[in-house]
C-alpha cells in the first residue's frame, strides 16, 4: 500500500489541484439541478414530470455538444505541455467556430424533434407544459457551446479556477432567477416551469459574456491572444478538432441517449414514474458531476504527458485518477445510502413519488463503480487522442446491452421503473471495462530486449 502511495503521490496531488476547482464548479451545477427540481417539484408534480422529459432530451443534446468540445482539451494540453502558447490560442479560435457550427446543427435537429413531440407517447397533460419550456432551452444551446469552448481551453492550460468561478456565479444567478420567475416574486408573473427555462437561458448568456471579458482583459491570457487574433483559421486544426470531437460526442451522446430513451420508456408508465425518475436523475447527477471533475483533470494531465511523449506518467496519471474516483464513489455512495429514506421527500410533496425514489436507490448504488471506471478511462483515452473506438464501445454498451436489458426488466418481466434502472449498471460497467482494456492496450510499455 505504501509503495502504491509513493508511486502515485505526486499524481494524486496534481489531479486534486486540477480537479478540485472543476468539482467545485460541478457542485454548483448539481446545486442548480437540485434547486430546479425542488422548486419545480414543490410548485407542481405535473410540472416536475414535464421537466423530467425535457431535461432528459436536452441532456442528450448538451452532453453531445460538450463531448464535441472535449476535442480541444488534448490539443491545447499537448501544446501547453510543450510551451506552444500562440498555437494554443489559435486552437481556441478554431474550436469556437467548430462549436458554433455544431450548436446550429443540433438546434435544427432539436427543432425537428419539437415538431414531433406529441408522437413520443408522453402523457397528454404534460404537452402544454413541455412545449414552451423546450423552446426556451433550445435557444440556449448556442451559448452552452460557446461557454464549453472557453472552458475546455482554460482546462487544457491547467487554469481550472476561471471556469469554476464563472459557473458558480452563473448558477447563483440562475437559482435567484428561478425563485423569482417560478413563483412570481418582485411583481413579476408566476411562470412556473417556463420561468425556470427563462432563468437558465439568461444565466447561460451572462456566463459567455463574462468569459469573453476575462479572456480579453486578463494579463494571463495575453500570450494566447496573439495566436487567437493573428494566426487565424487553420484547416489542419479544424480537421483535428473534428477528428477528436465527433467520436467523443457520439460516445457521450450514446451514454446519455440510453438515459434519455429510458426516460421515454418510463414516461409510458405514467407521470408518477417519470417524476421519480427526474428526482433520481438529479441525485445521480450529483455523483456524475463529481466524477466528471476528476475525469477532466485526468484528461488534462494525460494530454500534458502525451505531449512530452512520457508514457509512464500517462499511465500513472490515469490509474491515479481511478484510485481517486473509487475513493470518491465510496464516500458519495455511503452518503446516498444513509439518506435513502429521506431523499424523495426533499424534492416533492408526493408520497408516491418519494416511495418510488427509495426503490431506485439500489440500482443507483450498483452502477457507481462502472460509472467511475468508464469516466476515468474515457478521459484517459481522450488525453492520448485515441477516441475512434470509443464510439463502438459506447454503441455496444448502451444500445446492445443497456437499453434491451432495461426494456426486458421494465416491461417483459414487469419490474416497472426499477427494471428500467437495473439496466444502467450493466451498460456503464461493460463500457468501463472495454475502455480500460483499450487504454491498457494503447499505453503498453515496450518490453526490454534481452541482452545478447
Model segments located where?
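N-terminal transmembrane alpha-helices
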Residues: 7-38, 42-43, 59-71, 75, ...
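Short runs within selected transmembrane alpha-helices of multi-pass transporters and secretion channels
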Residues: 69, 137-155, 163-171, 196-211, ...
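Short alpha-helical transmembrane segments in multi-pass integral membrane proteins
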Residues: 1-19, 76-142, 188-246, 302-367, ...
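Helix-terminus/linker motif at the lipid-water interface of multi-pass membrane proteins
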Residues: 27, 31-49, 117-124, 180-193, ...
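Small-residue hotspots at the loop-to-helix junctions and early N-terminal turns
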Residues: 45-56, 130, 134, 197, ...
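Hydrophobic residues within alpha-helical transmembrane segments
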Residues: 20, 24, 54-57, 97, ...
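Transmembrane helical elements of multi-pass membrane transporters/channels
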Residues: 17-36, 136, 147, 170, ...
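Small-residue-rich hydrophobic transmembrane alpha-helices
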Residues: 48-112, 144-158, 162-163, 263, ...
Amino acid at each position: 500500500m505504501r509503495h502504491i502511495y509513493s508511486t502515485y503521490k505526486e499524481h494524486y496531488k496534481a489531479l486534486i489541484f486540477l480537479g478540485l476547482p472543476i468539482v467545485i464548479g460541478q457542485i454548483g451545477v448539481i446545486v442548480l439541478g437540485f434547486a430546479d427540481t425542488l422548486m419545480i417539484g414543490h410548485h407542481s408534480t405535473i410540472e416536475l414530470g414535464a421537466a423530467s422529459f425535457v431535461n432528459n432530451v436536452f441532456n442528450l443534446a448538451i452532453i453531445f455538444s460538450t463531448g464535441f468540445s472535449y476535442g480541444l482539451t488534448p490539443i491545447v494540453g499537448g501544446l501547453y505541455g510543450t510551451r506552444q502558447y500562440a498555437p494554443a490560442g489559435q486552437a481556441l479560435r478554431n474550436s469556437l467556430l467548430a462549436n458554433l457550427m455544431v450548436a446550429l446543427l443540433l438546434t435544427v435537429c432539436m427543432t425537428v424533434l419539437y415538431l414531433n413531440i406529441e408522437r413520443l407517447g408522453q402523457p397528454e397533460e404534460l404537452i402544454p407544459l413541455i412545449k414552451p419550456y423546450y423552446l426556451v432551452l433550445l435557444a440556449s444551446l448556442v451559448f452552452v457551446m460557446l461557454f464549453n469552448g472557453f472552458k475546455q481551453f482554460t482546462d487544457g492550460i491547467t487554469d481550472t479556477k476561471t471556469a469554476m468561478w464563472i459557473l458558480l456565479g452563473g448558477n447563483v444567478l440562475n437559482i435567484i432567477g428561478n425563485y423569482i420567475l417560478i413563483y412570481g416574486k418582485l411583481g413579476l408573473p408566476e411562470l412556473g416551469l417556463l420561468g425556470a427555462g427563462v432563468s437558465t437561458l439568461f444565466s447561460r448568456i451572462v456566463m459567455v459574456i463574462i468569459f469573453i471579458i476575462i479572456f480579453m482583459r486578463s494579463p494571463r491570457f495575453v500570450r494566447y491572444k496573439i495566436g487567437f487574433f493573428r494566426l487565424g483559421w487553420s484547416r489542419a486544426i479544424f480537421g483535428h478538432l473534428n477528428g477528436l470531437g465527433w467520436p467523443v460526442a457520439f460516445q457521450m451522446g450514446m451514454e446519455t441517449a440510453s438515459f434519455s430513451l429510458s426516460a421515454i420508456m418510463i414516461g409510458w408508465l405514467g407521470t408518477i414514474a417519470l417524476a421519480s425518475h427526474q428526482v433520481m436523475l438529479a441525485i445521480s447527477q450529483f455523483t456524475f458531476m463529481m466524477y466528471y471533475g476528476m475525469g477532466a483533470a485526468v484528461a488534462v494531465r494525460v494530454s500534458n504527458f502525451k505531449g512530452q511523449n512520457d508514457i509512464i506518467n500517462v499511465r500513472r496519471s490515469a490509474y491515479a485518477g481511478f484510485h481517486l474516483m473509487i475513493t470518491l464513489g465510496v464516500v458519495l455512495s455511503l452518503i446516498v445510502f444513509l439518506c435513502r429514506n429521506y431523499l424523495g421527500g426533499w424534492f416533492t410533496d408526493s408520497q408516491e413519488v418519494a416511495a418510488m425514489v427509495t426503490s431506485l436507490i439500489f440500482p443507483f448504488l450498483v452502477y457507481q463503480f462502472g460509472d467511475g471506471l468508464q469516466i476515468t478511462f474515457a478521459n484517459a483515452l481522450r488525453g492520448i487522442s485515441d477516441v475512434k473506438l470509443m464510439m463502438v464501445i459506447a454503441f455496444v454498451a448502451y444500445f446492445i446491452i443497456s437499453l434491451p436489458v432495461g426494456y426486458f426488466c421494465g416491461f417483459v418481466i414487469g419490474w416497472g421503473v426499477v427494471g428500467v434502472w437495473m439496466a444502467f449498471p450493466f451498460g456503464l460497467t461493460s463500457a468501463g471495462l472495454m475502455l480500460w482494456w483499450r487504454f491498457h492496450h494503447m499505453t503498453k510499455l515496450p518490453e526490454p530486449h534481452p541482452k545478447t
